[in-house]
Amino acid sequence: MEKKKAMQIEGYPIEGLSIGGHETCIIFPSLRIAFDIGRCPHRAISQDFLFISHSHMDHIGGLPMYVATRGLYKMKPPTIIVPASIKETVESLFEVHRKLDSSELKHNLVGLDIGEEFIIRKDLKVKAFKTFHVIQSQGYVVYSTKYKLKKEYIGLSGNEIKNLKVSGVEITDSIITPEVAFTGDTTSDFVVDETNADALKAKVLVMESTFLDDSVSVEHARDYGHIHISEIVNHAEKFENKAILLIHFSARYTVKEIEDAVSALPPPLEGRVFALTQGF
């Protein structure tokens, strides 16, 4: 069977599956990050960092398998970031599986509250942002950090710059850029929450759009903690992202119906919205 080529958006290869109620796992292999784990698709196993948005089974069900398979392959223990409110319960989940599986299931579990940051490396960090689902949930923004020589030191020799550094002078400015945002499951309320500005400025926004047509009302979508595509149109001017990847479509839709709904999006969304249809 021919391997399907990864989708590439704004320079980021993106892989994964997302079918509403069935499974969601979005993978950014160049960042070594997966968002949610679904049923643990094979490509997720090689990602060192896993960010969980909420504890519904279609988003967290494959968690023990993710850790167990990394152990089987003798990979380093992964780092798993979960909402702080469910950290203790996730710890209990692993204790049960250790007893069942008679294995260590080594991993690093981190509880992150909304607004808190997790440092992946010097030039990459992730912050949790507020989302609105029927249970405790949160999204994540990935930021890159670049260091630029301050204007007043441009033109100095290498030795002069080295001497300044040695003497403790801060010679660079930090340029922090929101690169990728992931919503998990949420209503459209996350769009109008003022604290979520960076999610709407990230180069790539991965957001749910569970419902696409008039057979389901906006009210129904909101009642179940989800987004109807018409709400994305209504908030179109708020999205400053270079690209938006829609995920988590209801299993009731076909690939053609999904693609038709996306291609019908008006400006300013037209041409910068993509759909993840793997598995449909």
UniProtKB/Swiss-Prot annotation:
It comes from Arabidopsis thaliana (Mouse-ear cress). Pfam families: Lactamase_B_2 (PF12706). Homodimer. GO terms for biological process: tRNA 3'-end processing; tRNA processing. It is found in: Cytoplasm. The gene is TRZ1. Changing H54L: Loss of catalytic activity, but no effect on dimerization and tRNA binding. This is tRNase Z TRZ1. SUPFAM superfamilies: Metallo-hydrolase/oxidoreductase. It is an enzyme of class 3 (hydrolase). The C-terminus (270-280) is essential for tRNA binding and processing activity. Zinc phosphodiesterase, which displays tRNA 3'-processing endonuclease activity. Involved in tRNA maturation, by removing a 3'-trailer from precursor tRNA. Can use bis-(p-nitophenyl) phosphate (bpNPP) as substrate. Involved in the processing of small nucleolar RNAs (snoRNAs). Changing D185G: Loss of catalytic activity, but no effect on dimerization and tRNA binding. GO terms for cellular component: cytoplasm; nucleus. Besides the tightly bound Zn(2+) ion, TRZ1 requires additional Ca(2+), Mn(2+) or Mg(2+) for pre-tRNA processing, while bpNPP hydrolysis occurs without addition of metal ions but is stimulated 2- to 3-fold when free Mn(2+) or Zn(2+) ions are added. Changing P83L: Loss of dimerization and catalytic activity. Its EC number is 3.1.26.11. Its cofactor is Zn(2+); Ca(2+); Mn(2+); Mg(2+).
